[in-house]
A protein has these predicted regions:
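Post-transcriptional modification and biogenesis factors for structured RNAs
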Residues: 1-152
């Protein structure tokens, strides 16, 4: 599996997702611009002593990421769809993208990939769940569906 963070803003979330990625043998993709430095203390603190083990790919732009992954199945996590993440039949090499914490994936990207937009059901009381929690929820459903096959 692959987790993709488009323009992440909060180092603690990215560090926590990095730790989850290590313990599930999942590749983590970060798409610039980032809201922090990869050397930041908060990032490494959230990732504990796992950060140096993260299978990390850093992309200069969304366009570069898309060009390099043309054949990939990419799902876009958003609150702006009705299609539940649990209704998807995930495959081992799928990608799940999450947008910046403050605004989510841009509308133009979502509109271009409506059939691959997925959501986590929740009540209408708040905007969204925490990014690292959302990544873990969807990742573990994908891993459950693939029999927790932790290979790359």
């Amino acid at each position: 599996m692959n987790i993709v963070l488009l323009n992440p803003e909060i180092p603690y979330n990215t560090g926590n997702i990095g730790r989850t990625s290590v313990l599930t043998n999942t590749k983590l993709h970060l798409i610039k611009p980032l809201g922090f430095s990869l050397d930041e203390k908060q990032l490494k603190r959230a990732g504990l002593d796992y950060w140096h083990l993260v299978d990390l790919v850093v992309w200069e732009s969304y366009e570069e990421f898309v060009e390099a992954n043309k054949e990939a199945r990419i799902f876009y996590a958003t609150t702006k769809t009705k299609q539940r993440y649990s209704d998807i039949e995930f495959k081992e090499n799928d990608f799940v993208m999450f947008g910046p914490e403050s605004r989510g994936i841009p509308e133009e990207i979502l509109n271009a990939h409506k059939e691959n937009c997925i959501t986590i059901p929740m009540i209408d009381m708040g905007r969204s769940l925490n990014l690292s929690n959302s990544a873990a929820i969807i990742l573990y459903e994908a891993l459950r569906q693939t029999d927790f096959n932790f290979k790359k």
